Amino acid sequence: MALALVLNSGSSSIKFQLVNPENSAIDEPYVSGLVEQIGEPNGRIVLKVEGEKYTLETPIADHSEGLNLAFDLMDQHNCGPSQLEITAVGHRVVHGGILFSAPELITDEIVEMIRDLIPLAPLHNPANVDGIDVARKILPDVPHVAVFDTGFFHSLPPAAALYAINKDVAAEHGIRRYGFHGTSHEFVSKRVVEILEKPTEEINTITFHLGNGASMAAVQGGRAVDTSMGMTPLAGLVMGTRSGDIDPGIVFHLSRTAGMSIDEIDNLLNKKSGVKGLSGVNDFRELREMIDNNDQDAWSAYNIYIHQLRRYLGSYMVALGRVDTIVFTAGVGENAQFVREDALAGLEMYGIEIDPERNALPNDGPRLISTDASQVKVFVIPTNEELAIARYAVKFA
């Protein structure tokens, strides 16, 4: 069985999957796992093989040791690189800047180009590079492929991609809208076309990727024409811990009146804002319980969250001119029926009508949740970024 190894390297963790690229979107990966608490004494590796779960607790010094230990654990359970045919390795890379519009076969030169983009993604790209370096040493004889979160949004028209600031400053410092979650938005927008069995160029779609991080995209005939995240993943929708769109003047105000440093404001907006900053929680199951108990902070957080979804929805309906499908995906988008219902409430005049019974069904693969009379077909489609990355990677094998 030919498999692709998919790696998602974070600052203190590595998520990995062994994926059969021929799988359907809802098939479980053959192997999945997580290396966590890298650099800490309480490191842990969790491995899941065809439904069975195995755990190794040990200090993990760095990404190299973490990935080697993960492979050793896989070998112990007959699913490691020495027993299986790994044909390619796909690496999720958060930021490709303006340099990368499509997946790239990784070479030393490509690694240096990704490293040069670290100023655009200082929280993500360094860890992505670490994962690439380690994996190339451990598996030197298979192609390694970088798949960029930003790649899908290279098609944005200038009016959507550029900010109204001094053009020379913007050009010098790479300031523009890049967009993120691109692999997910592309995956579900392609999937809905397959479900409808229509030519890609005939379908206009609005995609909601709603997880702890959240973004939306307007996709016209298979090409992204707008998206809610910007130069960084901080922009756009209200998220679990991120503020989303705010008046930029707030940054100056906090600096001048509260004496906060840039790093403190960065931490506030990225980690202490959003739904959690407003309500104290960022898990929508907890938020729903609080709302049911009439917690006013939870109500306020939820209303602000929904308001921002609807603002972007209206904007993208205008940008597309004609909307054929709407797709919800990711943790909240796939599982929180009340979010879907409230995001699309009262839009029957625009041809959008949710079927309450369909919307209430459990998350079990792609499904239609709009009424038969709805002009706009609304779907819940589970995203599978790892499968998408695996399929890209094996093309280079």
From Swiss-Prot:
<feature type="site" description="Transition state stabilizer">
    <location>
        <position position="181"/>
    </location>
</feature>
<dbReference type="InterPro" id="IPR023865">
    <property type="entry name" value="Aliphatic_acid_kinase_CS"/>
</dbReference>
<keyword id="KW-0479">Metal-binding</keyword>
<feature type="binding site">
    <location>
        <position position="385"/>
    </location>
    <ligand>
        <name>Mg(2+)</name>
    </ligand>
</feature>
<keyword id="KW-0808">Transferase</keyword>
<comment type="pathway">
    <text>Metabolic intermediate biosynthesis; acetyl-CoA biosynthesis; acetyl-CoA from acetate: step 1/2.</text>
</comment>
<feature type="binding site">
    <location>
        <begin position="209"/>
        <end position="213"/>
    </location>
    <ligand>
        <name>ATP</name>
    </ligand>
</feature>
<keyword id="KW-0067">ATP-binding</keyword>
<comment type="similarity">
    <text>Belongs to the acetokinase family.</text>
</comment>
<keyword id="KW-0963">Cytoplasm</keyword>
<dbReference type="Pfam" id="PF00871">
    <property type="entry name" value="Acetate_kinase"/>
</dbReference>
<dbReference type="GO" id="GO:0000287">
    <property type="term" value="F:magnesium ion binding"/>
</dbReference>
<comment type="function">
    <text>Catalyzes the formation of acetyl phosphate from acetate and ATP. Can also catalyze the reverse reaction.</text>
</comment>
<keyword id="KW-0547">Nucleotide-binding</keyword>
<feature type="binding site">
    <location>
        <position position="92"/>
    </location>
    <ligand>
        <name>substrate</name>
    </ligand>
</feature>
<dbReference type="GO" id="GO:0006083">
    <property type="term" value="P:acetate metabolic process"/>
</dbReference>
<comment type="subunit">
    <text>Homodimer.</text>
</comment>
<feature type="binding site">
    <location>
        <begin position="283"/>
        <end position="285"/>
    </location>
    <ligand>
        <name>ATP</name>
    </ligand>
</feature>
<keyword id="KW-0418">Kinase</keyword>
<keyword id="KW-0460">Magnesium</keyword>
<feature type="binding site">
    <location>
        <begin position="331"/>
        <end position="335"/>
    </location>
    <ligand>
        <name>ATP</name>
    </ligand>
</feature>
<dbReference type="InterPro" id="IPR000890">
    <property type="entry name" value="Aliphatic_acid_kin_short-chain"/>
</dbReference>
<protein>
    <recommendedName>
        <fullName>Acetate kinase</fullName>
        <ecNumber>2.7.2.1</ecNumber>
    </recommendedName>
</protein>
<dbReference type="GO" id="GO:0005737">
    <property type="term" value="C:cytoplasm"/>
</dbReference>
<dbReference type="InterPro" id="IPR004372">
    <property type="entry name" value="Ac/propionate_kinase"/>
</dbReference>
<feature type="binding site">
    <location>
        <position position="15"/>
    </location>
    <ligand>
        <name>ATP</name>
    </ligand>
</feature>
<dbReference type="GO" id="GO:0008776">
    <property type="term" value="F:acetate kinase activity"/>
</dbReference>
<feature type="site" description="Transition state stabilizer">
    <location>
        <position position="242"/>
    </location>
</feature>
<dbReference type="GO" id="GO:0005524">
    <property type="term" value="F:ATP binding"/>
</dbReference>
<dbReference type="GO" id="GO:0006085">
    <property type="term" value="P:acetyl-CoA biosynthetic process"/>
</dbReference>
<feature type="active site" description="Proton donor/acceptor">
    <location>
        <position position="149"/>
    </location>
</feature>
<dbReference type="InterPro" id="IPR043129">
    <property type="entry name" value="ATPase_NBD"/>
</dbReference>
<feature type="binding site">
    <location>
        <position position="8"/>
    </location>
    <ligand>
        <name>Mg(2+)</name>
    </ligand>
</feature>
